[in-house]
């Protein structure tokens, strides 16, 4: 049985209910809550629904407002809470749009308008952000928005399970990829992203070796594991580095796997960091390996703003 999040219209309490349930009793205020959109629309005029729809369209910018504050929460231990908070904001904007679509039967038109307006707003944000000497480049700014779309906005739209959720997610991704062909990404879900934090196989070394068609017990991975367990774990600094790596590695892999150029990125990680690290291990130069390892973690943290 799948569960979805809804909010009580009286107290705004967060309710986790089966996706097939049409009504329930609010656990917080005792209100009898109905989720049957069609029923709720019967008592509202077309003018009211249209006005609320237009207002929601004008508020689409709220879907990426504060993205620079939210992105650093995409880590093990903080993603779930930050996503649920973002979900509330997303539902407040998208629910009136869903109701208008249900009333008018114009799902395709609604998806087209939302996509057009949203991408236009994103374009304005990107173009209006001033780049300064030593500050973020335009490419860096686009990368930030791609990251936010990939791990927050698109998963939020899909999580709500609106009648047009999948169509809207596809339209936004397709439109973004047309406008930014060097910054493409694939459709992900909150469930898949959050489960990635619980899997040991999502670490960077494993992901890179898998991209190179190497087995989970290959020579390279065993060498990295031995370095971790026998050298890094022997010092407090090394233990702290391992802990930081475990905090961010699942997020990095989850994001890279949804970027269309992930194979290239993994090859770059191998050639720039992991291969030199492996060669240092083989030569007994463990401090050099630690240096490569530390630099890789710092670079990836900066890339994902975490």
Which sequence ranges carry the predicted segments?
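Short Cys/His-rich Zn2+-coordinating modules
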Residues: 6-14, 182-187
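Short cysteine-rich clusters marking metal-coordination/redox-active sites
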Residues: 8-11, 24-29
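Cys/His-coordinated zinc-binding microdomains
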Residues: 12, 30, 203-206
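Short functional micro-motifs and their immediate structural scaffolds
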Residues: 16, 34, 207
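Short Cys/His-rich micro-motifs in 6-15 aa windows
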Residues: 29-39
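Long, compositionally biased charged/polar accessory segments in the mid-to-C-terminal portions
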Residues: 42-306
């Amino acid at each position: 049985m799948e569960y979805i999040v809804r909010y009580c219209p009286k107290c705004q309490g967060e309710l986790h209910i089966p996706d097939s349930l049409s009504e329930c009793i609010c656990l917080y205020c005792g209100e009898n809550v109905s989720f049957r959109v069609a029923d709720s629309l019967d008592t509202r005029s077309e003018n009211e629904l249209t006005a609320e729809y237009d207002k929601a369209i004008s508020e689409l910018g709220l879907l990426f407002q504060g993205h620079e504050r939210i992105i650093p929460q995409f880590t093990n231990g903080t993603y779930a809470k930050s996503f649920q908070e973002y979900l509330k904001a997303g539902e407040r904007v998208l629910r009136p749009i869903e109701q208008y679509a249900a009333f008018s039967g114009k799902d395709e038109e609604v998806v087209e308008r939302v996509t057009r307006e949203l991408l236009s707003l994103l374009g304005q944000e990107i173009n209006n952000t001033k780049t300064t000497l030593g500050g973020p480049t335009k490419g860096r700014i686009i990368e930030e928005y791609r990251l936010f779309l990939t791990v927050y906005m698109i998963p939020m739209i899909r999580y709500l399970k609106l009648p047009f959720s999948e169509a809207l997610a596809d339209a936004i991704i397709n439109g973004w990829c047309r406008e930014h062909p060097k910054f493409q990404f694939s459709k992900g879900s909150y469930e898949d992203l959050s489960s990635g934090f619980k899997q040991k196989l999502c670490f960077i070394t494993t992901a890179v070796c898998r991209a190179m068609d190497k087995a989970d017990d290959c020579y390279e991975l065993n060498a990295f594991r031995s370095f971790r367990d026998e050298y890094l774990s022997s010092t407090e600094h090394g233990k702290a580095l391992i802990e930081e790596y475990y905090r961010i590695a699942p997020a990095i892999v989850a994001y890279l796997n949804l970027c269309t150029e992930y194979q290239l990125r993994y090859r770059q990680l191998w050639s720039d960091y992991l291969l030199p690290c492996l060669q240092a291990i083989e030569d007994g130069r463990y401090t050099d390996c630690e240096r490569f390892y530390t630099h890789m973690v710092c670079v990836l943290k900066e890339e994902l703003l975490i």
